[in-house]
Amino acid sequence: MDQTRRRNHHKRRVTKKLINEYPELALDIEEIMEKWIELLLPIENNIKLLSLLKEKGYSLYIISNFHLDAYNRFLKKQDWFTLFDGAIISAKEKLIKPDLRIYELLLERYQLKADECLFIDDSLNNINACKNVGMDGIHLPDNSKLEEELKEHHII
């Protein structure tokens, strides 16, 4: 089954399960499941930090477990994605964090040195994986602390 069909199957299965559990919310559930990507909002302070990092000369990359079409829709809607120099999207690459190969692919594709990379993620498993390929990592379960962490690492 290809990615799109698998994703649509999963979305239908989840939608059906939620509607079975909360039948009185069926219309709301269907609408949210159809438009969930539009409900995602960036953390404004973190967007400012991305701009600051670019001004300081840092290259910025994404490793994301986004579905490809969701990523593409989000990319069109959010102009701050242009701040990134490259992206590894799991659905496109058929790899998913914390598989070490996804981090290695980033390094290889963009000719990066692991010991010069800092990876930030909300999952400790993903941070451990990045460290296994030689990157430094910041575990950030609370995105509001990004500025504080970057200061502690003497980046800003």
Residue ranges and their predicted role:
Residues R7-N8, L53, I62, A87, ...:
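Generic structural signal for small/hydrophobic residues in well-ordered secondary structure
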Residues K11-T15, Y71, Y103:
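A general structural signal for well-ordered alpha-helical segments in protein cores
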Residues D2-I32:
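A metal-dependent, Asp-based hydrolase signature
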